[in-house]
């Protein structure tokens, strides 16, 4: 029979404070730090909103990482906390211990609460407390510095989530006192007018990652360009399935010129992804030459580019240190691949991922990229499936990978000799050819993970048709 340990003095003190909310409110400002986090966690768990409102006003740390405690925003809890912040911001005589500068609604700092395991199971030693205070008690900003509220935002629907809508209204009513900082903003289906309303409230210089899906390029450029220019700390920029409704090449050129000027101010950009690249066909150089910071990741996918577009990729220093290059499903079969080969030679020392899946590259074009590819000594991932390769071309390609010792994942198409009149694999022919290709590869290096022939995606397993099967050859 186990004997339950008696409540600790710390636990009893906290329970007493929470039983009488009026008492806890009057005591908050003098509450020892050793009680603050466990008491806040218990008040949060029990949804003692009045207690939470007051605790926020006397919060003894510079940051309140609420997002890691509240995985999903709860409207009443959010209202209670924001009410406390409002009272804190509007007080003429701020509490003498006031340190709070940041309310973080992102799920980013579980360690903050993990240092205080459980609501009451708190082990506190003087040396650890002093270290904790040193970490938290950074030099305070001036009294008039805006309070920062951090949140990652995903706009999916109208009407907006009620918590997000309430937060937007609360921040808007306190312009100048509060900065709504959004390190990651994703917009899926929200109409552009609602996205603009959100951007007027968000502190634009805080946005580090921006994703925009399913918009018209002309409207996006005309309506959002002025906001993009203010995102000075942007490091990741994604445009996915943005379409264009004009066939006027001259108009497209003018729009691309306007859009490209945005990149002159993006000095921290490291990733640029454009899915459905056709809008920039014939105008890509206007964008590339405006890039100010060397990119690590460039993804231009789905659609077609002209030879002049591919040529410009090797001519600007901003693309000279790429680690990841993705041109999947950009149709390249009608152009010379010498410019792509020149780019591979330029970035050979840094390139780690190369995706040329579904580009419909013909074996007659292959020789243009082999010298550059063979020098990519840091390459770990190479996708080359869904291209038109003969058996001889595939053998040549595999031999040129002999020096790529870091390759850990690679995909290749079935040779055209194994395809029937419907461009489907004849497995009776394909199976021995695949074995022959593996023998060719093992003569020059030992592969780690390789897929030859029609396969699902090695990362997610999805396939484009029922006929596709996974064939892990090694």
UniProtKB/Swiss-Prot annotation:
InterPro entries, sorted: LRR_dom_sf, PRAME, PRAME_domain
Sequence ranges of the LRR repeats: 97-124, 179-203, 204-230, 231-265, 266-291, 292-323, 324-342, 348-375, 376-400
Keyword Repeat set for record: yes
MF GO annotations: ubiquitin-like ligase-substrate adaptor activity
Top-rank lineage group of the source organism: Eukaryota
An example Gene Ontology CC term for this record: cytoplasm
Keyword tags: Leucine-rich repeat, Repeat
Any one of the GO BP annotations: negative regulation of apoptotic process
Family the entry assigns: Belongs to the PRAME family.
Protein name per its UniProtKB record: PRAME family member 13
Native source organism of the sequence: Homo sapiens (Human)
Gene: PRAMEF13
């Amino acid at each position: 029979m186990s004997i339950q340990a008696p409540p600790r003095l710390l636990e009893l003190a906290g329970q007493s404070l929470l039983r009488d909310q009026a008492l806890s409110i009057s005591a908050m400002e003098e509450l020892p730090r050793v009680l603050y986090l466990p008491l806040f966690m218990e008040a949060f768990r029990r949804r003692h909103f009045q207690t939470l409102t007051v605790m926020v006003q006397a919060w003894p740390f510079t940051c309140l990482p609420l997002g890691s405690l509240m995985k999903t925003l709860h409207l009443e809890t959010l209202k209670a906390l924001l009410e406390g912040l409002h009272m804190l911001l509007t007080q003429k005589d701020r509490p003498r211990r006031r340190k709070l500068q940041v309310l973080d609604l992102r799920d980013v700092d579980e360690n903050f609460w993990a240092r205080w395991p459980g609501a009451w199971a708190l082990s506190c030693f003087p040396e650890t407390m002093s270290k904790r205070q040193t970490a938290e008690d950074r030099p305070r900003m001036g009294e008039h510095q805006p309070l920062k509220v951090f949140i990652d935002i995903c706009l999916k629907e109208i009407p907006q989530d009620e918590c997000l809508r309430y937060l937007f209204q609360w921040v808007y009513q306190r312009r100048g006192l509060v900065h709504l900082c959004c390190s990651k903003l994703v917009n899926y289906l929200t109409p552009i007018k609602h996205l603009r309303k959100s951007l007027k409230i968000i502190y634009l210089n805080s946005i580090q990652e921006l994703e925009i899906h399913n918009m018209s390029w002309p409207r996006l450029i005309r309506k959002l360009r002025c906001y993009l220019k203010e995102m000075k700390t942007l490091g990741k920029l994604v445009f996915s399935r943005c379409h264009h409704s004009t066939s006027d090449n001259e108009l497209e050129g003018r729009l691309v010129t306007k859009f490209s000027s945005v990149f002159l101010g993006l000095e921290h950009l490291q990733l640029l992804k454009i899915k459905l690249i056709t809008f920039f066909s014939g105008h890509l150089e206007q964008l590339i030459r405006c890039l100010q910071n060397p990119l690590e990741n460039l993804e231009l996918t789905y659609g077609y580019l002209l030879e002049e577009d591919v040529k410009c990729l090797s001519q600007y220093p901003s693309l000279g240190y790429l680690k990841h290059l993705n041109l999947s499903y950009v149709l390249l079969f009608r152009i010379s691949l010498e410019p792509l080969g020149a780019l591979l030679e330029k970035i050979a020392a840094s390139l780690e991922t190369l995706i040329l899946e579904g580009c419909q590259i013909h074996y007659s074009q292959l020789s243009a990229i082999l010298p550059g590819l063979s020098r990519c000594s840091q390459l770990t991932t190479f996708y080359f499936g869904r291209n038109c390769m003969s058996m001889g071309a595939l053998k040549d390609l595999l031999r040129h990978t002999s020096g790529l010792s870091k390759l850990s994942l690679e995909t290749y198409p079935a040779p055209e000799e194994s395809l029937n009149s419907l461009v489907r694999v004849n497995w009776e022919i394909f199976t021995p050819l695949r074995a022959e290709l593996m023998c060719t590869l093992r003569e020059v290096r030992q592969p780690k993970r390789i897929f030859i022939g029609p396969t699902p995606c090695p990362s997610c397993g999805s396939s484009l048709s029922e006929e596709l099967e996974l064939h892990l050859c090694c």
